[in-house]
C-alpha cells in the first residue's frame, strides 16, 4: 500500500472484482505458550482454545509459507502498554502474583481484579503476549507488506485505562488502533462479539479518527452499555454506533442489519484500515451467549469485510464453547486466505473435542429469534440516520489531538525497539464475556440467574450511559494530531517452519 494514499481509505464499496477466491497477503501471529495460561478451575475463559485453533490450521495445511506468513510475536513492554493504560495499573499487573495478591486487597479492588479477572501464574506475560501480537499485526499492515493480519489470541475489548473487566486485562485492540493511527487518518473498529465493545468505545468516544461499531446483545446483560443512543461526544459525535440486538438472532437477521450498516459506514467514513473483533460467543450454543449464528453466518462478516480490499486486522475475543471457537476461527482464517476448507475435520490432537459430528461447520439451533423484522428495520433506520449526519470523510478536519503513538525510545541494553513492533510478531489476546444476566460480572451468572438491584444497574459498569454522561477519560492527554509512519523493520520470528514452533501441537505438521 502506498503511504501517500493511506488517508483515502481504500475502496469505500465492496468490489465485485475482489472475488472471495482472490488471494490476499495474510500474516498470522501465534505464540506457542499462549495456550498454557490458565484462568483457574471453573473459569469459562480458556486460552487453550487458541492452541486448538492453531492445531486445526496446521492440519488443514494453512500454516504453510505458501499460504500465509506465521509469526511469533514479541512481548509488549511496559512502555508499549502505557500508550493507553495508566502507569500504576501496568505496574500492578506486572507485580501481582497469586501468592502476593491478598496483601494488595485495596489494589485488587481499585483495578477490578478478582473474580471475573483473576490473578493467575504468568498473568503479565500473558498480557504482554497477546498485546504484542495485536500491535505487531498492526505494524505489519502499516508497512503494506500484508493485506490481512490475524491474532486470534487478541480482541480483549472490555479492558479500560486503569481497570480490568470481563476477563480482559490489557486492551490490545486500543493499542493496535493507536499503531494504525500512525499511518491512517481514519480507522474503523467493528465488534461482532455478543458483548458490547465498551472498552474500545470508551477509549475513542471523543474523536472522529476512530469510528466504533458494535453489534451486541443489549439489556440486562454484561457490560450493560451499548445503547443505540450512545453515539459519541464532542468531535466524536456520530462516530460511535451501537446496534442492540435480542436473543436468538440468526444468520439471515444478522446479515440483514450488518451489511447495510457496514456498507454505509464504509461509504461515508472511508477508513484507511479496519479492525474486526471476531468474538465467537455470538455463535449458537455458546456457554455464555444467547445468539444463534452458525459458523458460516459469523464468517460472513469476515468475508464481507475482506471484499472491501482495505487493510484488515482480525482479532479474537469472546467464545466459551471452545470446540466451536476453534472451528469458527479456523474457518475464518480460510475465508481470509480465500481457501475453501473441507467440512470433514482432519484428524488432530484435539479430535475428540469435536465429536460426534467432527465437522468444521458450527450449526445453528432451532432457538426462538426474538428480533422481529420490524425491530431490526427500526434499528437500521436509526443508525443510517446518524450516519447521514456525518461530514463526508474526505473533507473531515482532524483537529483534535490523537493518541500519541510514537515508537518507544530504545533502551541501551535492549534490542532495537522497532523490532518490538514488527508486524512479524504474533501473539494474540482473547478475552471478555458476560455470563448470565448481570451487567456487573460474568462469573456470577454461570448457571445462576442473579437478581440485579437498582444500585447495580446504576453504577459505573451497569448503567445505560447517554451522551450526557459518557465523557470517558480521553486517550487523551497523549493525543497529537501529527501522523507518523512507522519505520520498524520486519524482525519478528517467523514460525512457518514446523521446527520453529517449540513442539506446539500441530506445528510439526
Curated annotation (Swiss-Prot):
Biased composition (Basic and acidic residues): 398-409, 418-434, 448-472
Compartment list: Nucleus
GO cellular component, one term: nucleus
Protein's recorded name: Histone deacetylase 2
Organism: Oryza sativa subsp. japonica (Rice)
Polar residues compositional bias, start-end: 481-494
Cofactor(s) in the UniProt record: Zn(2+)
Matching InterPro entries: HDAC_PDAC (IPR050284), His_deacetylse (IPR000286), His_deacetylse_1 (IPR003084), His_deacetylse_dom (IPR023801), His_deacetylse_dom_sf (IPR037138), Ureohydrolase_dom_sf (IPR023696)
Additional comment: Plants silencing HDAC3 exhibit semi-dwarf phenotype.
Amino acid at each position: 500500500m502506498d503511504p501517500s494514499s493511506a488517508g483515502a481509505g481504500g475502496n469505500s464499496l465492496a468490489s465485485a472484482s475482489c472475488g472471495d477466491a482472490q488471494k490476499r497477503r495474510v500474516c498470522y501471529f501465534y505464540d506457542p505458550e499462549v495456550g498454557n495460561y490458565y484462568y483457574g478451575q471453573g473459569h469459562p475463559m480458556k486460552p487453550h482454545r487458541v492452541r486448538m485453533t492453531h492445531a486445526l490450521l496446521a492440519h488443514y495445511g494453512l500454516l504453510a509459507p505458501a499460504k500465509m506468513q506465521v509469526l511469533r510475536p514479541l512481548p509488549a513492554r511496559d512502555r508499549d502498554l502505557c500508550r493507553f493504560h495508566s502507569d500504576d495499573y501496568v505496574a500492578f499487573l506486572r507485580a501481582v502474583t497469586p501468592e502476593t495478591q491478598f496483601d494488595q486487597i485495596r489494589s485488587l479492588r481499585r483495578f477490578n481484579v478478582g473474580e471475573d479477572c483473576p490473578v493467575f501464574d504468568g498473568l503479565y506475560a500473558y498480557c504482554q503476549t497477546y498485546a504484542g501480537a495485536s500491535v505487531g499485526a498492526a505494524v505489519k499492515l502499516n508497512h503494506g507488506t500484508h493485506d490481512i493480519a490475524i491474532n486470534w489470541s487478541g480482541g480483549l475489548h472490555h479492558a479500560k485505562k486503569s481497570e480490568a473487566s470481563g476477563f480482559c486485562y490489557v486492551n490490545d485492540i486500543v493499542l493496535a488502533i493507536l499503531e494504525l493511527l500512525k499511518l491512517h487518518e481514519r480507522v474503523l473498529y467493528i465488534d461482532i462479539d455478543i458483548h458490547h465493545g465498551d472498552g474500545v468505545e470508551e477509549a475513542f468516544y471523543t474523536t472522529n479518527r476512530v469510528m466504533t461499531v458494535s453489534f451486541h446483545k443489549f439489556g440486562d446483560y454484561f457490560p450493560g452499555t451499548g445503547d443505540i443512543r450512545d453515539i459519541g461526544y464532542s468531535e466524536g459525535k456520530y462516530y460511535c454506533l451501537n446496534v442492540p440486538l435480542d436473543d436468538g438472532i440468526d444468520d439471515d437477521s444478522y446479515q440483514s442489519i450488518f451489511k447495510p450498516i457496514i456498507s454505509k459506514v464504509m461509504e461515508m467514513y472511508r477508513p484507511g484500515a479496519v479492525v474486526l473483533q471476531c468474538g465467537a460467543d455470538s455463535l449458537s450454543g455458546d456457554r455464555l451467549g444467547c445468539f444463534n449464528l452458525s459458523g458460516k453466518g459469523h464468517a460472513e462478516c469476515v468475508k464481507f469485510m475482506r471484499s472491501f480490499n482495505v487493510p484488515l486486522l482480525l482479532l479474537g475475543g469472546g467464545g466459551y464453547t471452545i470446540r466451536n471457537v476453534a472451528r469458527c476461527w479456523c474457518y475464518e482464517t480460510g475465508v481470509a486466505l480465500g481457501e475453501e476448507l473441507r467440512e470433514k475435520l482432519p484428524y488432530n490432537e484435539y479430535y475428540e473435542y469435536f465429536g460426534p459430528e467432527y465437522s468444521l461447520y458450527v450449526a445453528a439451533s432451532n432457538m426462538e429469534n426474538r428480533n422481529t423484522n420490524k425491530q431490526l428495520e427500526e434499528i437500521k433506520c436509526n443508525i443510517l440516520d446518524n450516519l447521514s449526519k456525518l461530514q463526508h470523510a474526505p473533507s473531515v478536519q482532524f483537529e483534535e489531538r490523537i493518541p500519541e503513538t510514537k515508537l518507544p525510545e530504545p533502551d541501551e541494553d535492549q534490542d532495537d525497539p522497532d523490532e518490538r513492533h514488527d508486524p512479524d510478531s504474533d501473539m494474540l489476546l482473547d478475552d471478555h464475556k458476560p455470563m448470565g444476566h448481570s451487567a456487573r460480572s460474568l462469573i456470577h451468572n454461570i448457571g445462576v440467574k442473579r437478581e440485579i438491584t437498582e444500585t447495580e444497574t446504576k453504577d459505573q459498569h451497569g448503567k445505560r450511559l447517554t451522551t450526557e454522561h459518557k465523557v470517558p477519560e480521553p486517550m487523551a492527554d497523549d493525543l497529537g494530531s501529527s501522523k507518523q509512519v512507522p519505520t520498524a523493520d520486519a524482525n519478528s520470528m517467523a514460525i512457518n517452519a514446523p521446527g520453529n514452533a517449540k513442539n506446539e501441537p500441530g506445528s510439526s505438521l
